[in-house]
């Protein structure tokens, strides 16, 4: 979830940014659903998030705080604790894992129907990650499988990405930043 804090600060990330760990919850935050997007690209070994981690970075006009939430089944129930204060969602899909698309669709539907999200016009950025993997689904196919065209009450955008190389991430963050700025006016 992403949010704008008092004083014009907000919270998102992509590889290549310098990160600081923070062990407190800011008033509003950005939930990121993939470890690859929330750690420095210079790291050699990216391991899955266990539970969650909190990271910060700045763009030219906003400061972002990212709650990197584990997508593992046993941790998904933690997501909802961060919905109220968030002002945007980044939902990361492994486009190379065709078998888990059904699970991704179910989790997306659960998220969209949560009382803290359902009636809010909150922007959603989808990262169709691992586009570098052979036989990965295109962002168009991911969009179709997740039925993204059925999302009528929230602005959304999907980007094909390769988080390890940072490809597609700036485009998505730029879109999200524009959406957050629009919400503030």
Predicted regions and their residues:
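TRAFAC-class small GTPase G-domain
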Residues: 1-185
């Amino acid at each position: 979830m992403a949010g704008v804090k008092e004083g014009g600060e907000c919270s998102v990330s992509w590889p290549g940014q310098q990160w600081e760990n923070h062990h407190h919850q800011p008033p509003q935050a950005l939930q990121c659903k993939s470890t690859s997007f929330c750690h420095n690209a210079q790291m050699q070994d990216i391991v899955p998030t266990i539970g969650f981690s909190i990271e910060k970075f700045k763009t030219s006009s906003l400061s972002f705080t990212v709650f990197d939430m584990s997508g593992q089944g046993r941790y998904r129930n933690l997501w909802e604790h961060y919905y109220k204060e968030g002002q945007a969602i980044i939902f990361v899909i492994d486009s190379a894992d065709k078998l888990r698309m059904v699970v991704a669709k179910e989790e997306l539907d659960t998220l969209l129907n949560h009382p803290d999200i359902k009636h809010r016009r909150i922007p959603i950025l989808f990262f169709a990650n691992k586009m570098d993997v052979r036989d990965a689904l295109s962002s168009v196919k991911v969009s179709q499988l997740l039925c993204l065209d059925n999302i009528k009450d929230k602005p959304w955008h999907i980007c094909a990405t390769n988080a390890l190389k940072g490809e597609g991430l700036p485009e998505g963050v730029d879109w999200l930043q524009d959406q957050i700025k629009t919400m503030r006016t």
